[in-house]
Amino acid sequence: MQQESDRNEQGYSSSPPSSNKQDSSDDTKKNHRREKNRIAAQKSRQRQTEKADSLHIESENLERLNSALRGEISGLREELKYLTCVLSTHQPVCVLGPTKPQAILPHVGSTRYQH
């Protein structure tokens, strides 16, 4: 396909080449341009591959983080069930009576609120 294009370029030139030196110079320029284009395409493919690899690694890291956070959520839900149960069994026997609700403080065991 490229050779056919090259033949067309040579066949439709406005004036015939003046000498072999001119042909050689044109061929050299064409080859140089092709080599630069080949190198640029190779670099582009390399960058594309590196970006895909980087995105794959980032995706795997996010999957692991997501899994860890889902585990933390599950653990916190279990803790909530347990504490709700403890509170419901304690309230009927509590001798202090109802008190004013205090400001909700972060849970001490939660890693989010530790400094």
From Swiss-Prot:
PANTHER family: BASIC LEUCINE ZIPPER TRANSCRIPTIONAL FACTOR ATF-LIKE, FOS TRANSCRIPTION FACTOR-RELATED. Residues 13-22 have a biased composition (Low complexity). GO terms for molecular function: DNA-binding transcription factor activity; DNA-binding transcription factor activity, RNA polymerase II-specific; RNA polymerase II cis-regulatory region sequence-specific DNA binding; sequence-specific DNA binding. This is Basic leucine zipper transcriptional factor ATF-like. Residues 29-51 are annotated as: Basic motif. Residues 55-83 are annotated as: Leucine-zipper. The keyword Repressor applies. Belongs to the bZIP family. It comes from the Eukaryota. It is found in: Nucleus; Cytoplasm. Coiled coil: none annotated. PROSITE patterns: BZIP, BZIP_BASIC.
